[in-house]
Every structure is written in structure tokens, then in C-alpha cells.
Curated annotation (Swiss-Prot):
InterPro entries: NADH_UbQ/plastoQ_OxRdtase_su6, Nuo/plastoQ_OxRdtase_6_NuoJ. This is NAD(P)H-quinone oxidoreductase subunit 6, chloroplastic. Signal peptide: none annotated. Its main location: plastid. GO terms for molecular function: NADH dehydrogenase (ubiquinone) activity; quinone binding. It comes from Mesostigma viride (Green alga). The gene is ndhG. Keywords: Chloroplast, Membrane, NAD, NADP, Plastid, Plastoquinone, Quinone, Thylakoid, Translocase, Transmembrane, Transmembrane helix, Transport. It is found in: Plastid, Chloroplast thylakoid membrane. One of its GO terms (cellular component) is chloroplast thylakoid membrane. The chain crosses the membrane at residues 10-30, 32-52, 61-81, 98-118, 144-164. Belongs to the complex I subunit 6 family. NDH shuttles electrons from NAD(P)H:plastoquinone, via FMN and iron-sulfur (Fe-S) centers, to quinones in the photosynthetic chain and possibly in a chloroplast respiratory chain. The immediate electron acceptor for the enzyme in this species is believed to be plastoquinone. Couples the redox reaction to proton translocation, and thus conserves the redox energy in a proton gradient.
Length: 189
């Protein structure tokens, strides 16, 4: 094994560890803002894996589209709609945790069996000539409708988050004006 192969294997191992730790942080951290930042880190690690697989265009698209656009929209939505609520633990919380653990473990076993039962191809012939134009043609011809649906869905999500945040701000401003003037609150009659 040459030195460059060792460096490539070490880089792949570090990116895989970063992806797994970041994904666990996204799921397990109680602060949703930190989860959003870790999601960006996971997406950057995945782009690094694409770079190691000699798919530079996919890596650049991963960073531009997912990290640069979608993760920023998610973080804006989190910051605009971040409500601090006290969650009351329910009586059947233990049953919910057990059921969700069972479902996650079942999916893990199912995916593990699928991975080990799949016949993987050792080498894949990748044609780099005109690959970017082929991807662009597929996106804007065969996959135009899903592409537009996703863009409209992201736009509606962002507009909805702004609308919800502004609606809450208006009610808070109205309540603060009433308390400033020492007037009785009309909602408490």
C-alpha cells in the first residue's frame, strides 16, 4: 500500500467518523440550533467523501445546494420559529421510548441485512467526459417536475416560518404596549 493510498484511507476514515458523530449529534442534542449546525457539518463531510470518490461536481453541488441553501433555510426557520416550551412528560413515555427503540433497531437490522446480501461491483467505469452536461440535462428534462416541487416546497416553508414569526411578534408588541400604559388586558375579561 502506497503512501497516497494510506492518506486517502485515513481521510476517508476521518470523514466517516465525522459524519457518524455529527449525525448522532443532530439526533441526540436537545438544542435544535446546535443540531442544525451539526447537520451542516455532516453535509460537508459527505461532500468530502464525494471528493475522495473523484466526483468533484457532486461534491460542489452538495456544498452549494445542501449546505449553502437548504441548511441555511433550516437554520433561519429554527431561529424564526424557535419556541421554548416546557414539555410535560407523559405517563407512557417509557412505552414510547421502547417502541421507537424497537423500530430503529428493526430498521438497523433490515438495512444491515440488505447491505451484506447485496452483490457489490468492485470497479465502476466512470466517464468524466460530459458528465456535468449529462447531469444538467437529466435534471432539467427527466427530473424537472421533482426539481420544481422541491424548490416550491422550500419556498413555502420559508414563507410559512416568516409568517408564524411575524404573527407572534405582533401579539407580543400589543401585550407590551398594554402593560406599558398600565391598561387592563382586554383578553383577560
Amino acid at each position: 500500500m502506497s503512501f497516497s493510498e494510506q492518506i486517502q484511507n485515513l481521510s476517508l476514515l476521518l470523514l466517516e467518523i465525522g459524519t457518524i458523530i455529527g449525525a448522532l449529534g443532530v439526533v441526540l442534542l436537545p438544542n435544535i440550533l446546535y443540531s442544525g449546525f451539526l447537520l451542516g457539518g455532516v453535509l460537508i463531510c459527505i461532500a468530502g467523501i464525494y471528493l475522495l470518490l473523484n466526483a468533484e461536481f457532486i461534491a460542489a453541488a452538495q456544498v452549494l445546494i445542501y449546505v449553502g441553501a437548504i441548511n441555511v433555510i433550516i437554520l433561519f426557520a429554527i431561529m424564526l420559529v424557535n419556541k421554548i416550551e416546557n414539555l410535560n412528560p407523559s405517563n407512557n413515555q417509557m412505552m414510547r421510548n421502547g417502541l421507537s427503540s424497537f423500530i430503529c433497531f428493526s430498521f438497523f437490522i433490515l438495512l444491515s441485512n440488505m447491505i451484506f446480501d447485496t452483490q457489490w461491483i468492485d470497479t465502476v467505469g466512470v466517464s468524466t467526459k460530459y458528465s456535468i452536461s449529462i447531469i444538467g440535462n437529466h435534471i432539467f428534462s427527466d427530473f424537472l417536475l421533482p426539481f420544481e416541487i422541491v424548490s416550491v416546497l422550500l419556498l413555502v416553508t420559508l414563507v410559512g416560518a416568516v409568517f408564524i414569526a411575524r404573527k407572534e411578534d405582533a401579539s407580543e408588541i400589543e401585550i407590551s404596549k398594554i402593560s406599558f400604559l398600565n391598561l387592563p388586558d382586554p383578553s383577560k375579561k
